[in-house]
């Protein structure tokens, strides 16, 4: 229940693996949905399934338990501050840079997220998240479909060419 778009794409047989990512360390954040090893001819169906699934989520609402679980998980990670092999200070500095680059007055905003998590928790039953989907995903005119298609044997050909030169 936590990944309806992913599940819809998998159920439709698009790609061997489907995942999403969000990059917000830039002035214009970017959200992407990736279907690995998908058939190039499924581009239209890929977009259609995503749009239909998002429209259904906006209309019927997101699973509130999944939203709460996601927020709780984010809060747990924030409070634990377990970054594995990476020093906390280094990662805190990198988090500060993500906001500091674009607003000199708020370098610590990413380190002070408990109020934001509480706000998100309070919005679960209000349609807030569905409105975000509508505004930033469905009504966004700045989308693109990018196909990265490998050329079979390209590395082998480059290696042979390099051997000839050497």
Q: Where would I find each of the regions flagged by the language model?
A:
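Extended alpha-helical coiled-coil "stalk/arm" regions that scaffold and mediate dimerization/assembly
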Residues: 123, 127-135
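N-terminal leader/propeptide and maturation segments of large enzyme subunits in energy/redox metabolism
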Residues: 153-158, 163-166
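M16 family metallopeptidases and their MPP-like homologs
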Residues: 6-123, 141-151, 157
């Amino acid at each position: 229940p936590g990944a309806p778009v992913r599940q819809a794409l998998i159920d439709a047989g698009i790609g061997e693996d489907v995942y999403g990512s969000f990059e917000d360390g830039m002035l214009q954040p970017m959200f992407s949905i990736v279907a690995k090893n998908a058939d190039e001819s499924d581009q239209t169906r890929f977009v259609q399934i995503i749009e239909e699934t998002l429209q259904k989520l906006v209309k019927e609402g997101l699973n509130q338990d999944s939203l709460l679980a996601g927020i709780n998980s984010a809060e747990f990670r924030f409070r634990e501050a377990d970054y594995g092999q990476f020093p906390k200070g280094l990662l805190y500095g990198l988090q500060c840079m993500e906001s500091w680059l674009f607003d000199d007055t708020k370098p610590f905003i990413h380190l002070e997220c408990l109020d934001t998590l509480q706000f998100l928790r309070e919005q679960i039953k209000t349609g807030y998240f569905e409105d975000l989907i509508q505004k930033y995903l469905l009504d966004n005119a700045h989308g693109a479909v990018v196909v990265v298609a490998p050329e079979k044997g390209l590395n082998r050909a480059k290696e042979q060419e390099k051997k000839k030169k050497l």
